Amino acid sequence: MLLEQQPINHEDRNVPQPIRSDGAGAIDTGPRNIIRDIQNPNIFVPPVTDEGMIPNLRFSFSDAPMKLDHGGWSREITVRQLPISTAIAGVNMSLTAGGVRELHWHKQAEWAYMLLGRARITAVDQDGRNFIADVGPGDLWYFPAGIPHSIQGLEHCEFLLVFDDGNFSEFSTLTISDWLAHTPKDVLSANFGVPENAFNSLPSEQVYIYQGNVPGSVASEDIQSPYGKVPMTFKHELLNQPPIQMPGGSVRIVDSSNFPISKTIAAALVQIEPGAMRELHWHPNSDEWQYYLTGQGRMTVFIGNGTARTFDYRAGDVGYVPSNAGHYIQNTGTETLWFLEMFKSNRYADVSLNQWMALTPKELVQSNLNAGSVMLDSLRKKKVPVVKYPGT
């Protein structure tokens, strides 16, 4: 027997109904999650220009299970949560002051963006050259596939990890504790040249994240390698990079041209003010994986043959756009919308619809679209990634 529930007052103006301004739709009097309907207005009432079916292009970290440890937590969005995301997977992780993501390595490259707080990262490359650095909000790091590394919180911190394989799982990485726990002690004794009883205190299973002590300064912790430091830094200070500034916002692009070690991930940090939008465009070289940092917005994706769908996004959401699919992103809120665009590529690339039309013979564009002079004369030969609505 169903439990009795308080009836929904469907005449309440705060309760959205699936009725579009053109009259299409009807009142929804059945079971529903009103909060989700409010958060996804363009899924609940799609724009009249939406048509056809597109795979889901949105998943929220709020819907991803947490892995809780002493020293921090983590959660992931992979192809298992967002099936279309075959190129990239993402992990949201937090560490306490002194919390350690243990020494480990991956088959995939790791790109990271610091969301808040400070952390220390270490790594050693295949030639015995080492690296140590502190990172803070807006800083990036990149570890190539197979490079062993660690992360430790200097204070409470949170960061986004991005991997160049949608099938990746943070919970199946190669860790030092797990390997040693599954290696016979006589083998460890031979490898390290010490008695077997020296390994009696080793963990019996994977540690993953643990609570440690806050380390001292980089200078006091740095180990001098006989082979020197890594030739290319694993750290990049993105917020210290001058942005491409526009009236409606800004863009900072980072790829192998200005962060040379980042061979498989390119990215852009995009700022869109209220009343502005990321212009109509597409990316010719890779799928796009997005992470929304602040604010709220909506994105419409066009994949051809009359098929376009609109999705709503807010802080903590992940978005996805297939390669070469046309799309735009609007700020639908009252605060600044910040998000990351990430690509499995060594270089960032996008094609602007406006610029393409401006650099094509005018008569050809006019005859193709039956466009008037007002539109044709307004086309821009230079790319403007973020544009403002007229009059705002």
UniProtKB/Swiss-Prot annotation:
Compartments, as annotated in UniProt: Cytoplasm
UniProt-annotated stretches for the region Disordered: 1-25
Catalytic residues (UniProt): 341 (proton donor)
Essential cofactor(s): Mn(2+)
GO biological process: oxalate metabolic process
Name used for this protein in its record: Oxalate decarboxylase OxdD
Residues holding Mn(2+) 2: 281, 283, 288, 327
Gene Ontology cellular component terms for the protein in this record: cytoplasm
Record has Transport as a keyword: no
Taxonomy, superkingdom: Bacteria
Organism expressing this protein natively: Bacillus subtilis (strain 168)
Gene name per UniProt: oxdD
Cofactor note: Binds 2 manganese ions per subunit.
Keywords: Cytoplasm, Decarboxylase, Lyase, Manganese, Metal-binding
Family the UniProt entry places it in: To B.subtilis OxdC.
Entry's EC annotation: 4.1.1.2
PANTHER family xref list: OXALATE-BINDING PROTEIN (PTHR35848), SLL1358 PROTEIN (PTHR35848:SF9)
Function per UniProt: Converts oxalate to formate and CO(2).
Ranges where the Cupin type-1 domain occurs: 59-200, 236-377
MF GO annotations: metal ion binding; oxalate decarboxylase activity
Hydrolase found in the keyword field: no
Coiled coil: none
Gene3D superfamilies membership: Jelly Rolls (2.60.120.10)
Catalytic activity entry: oxalate + H(+) = formate + CO2
Residues engaged in binding Mn(2+) 1: 104, 106, 110, 149
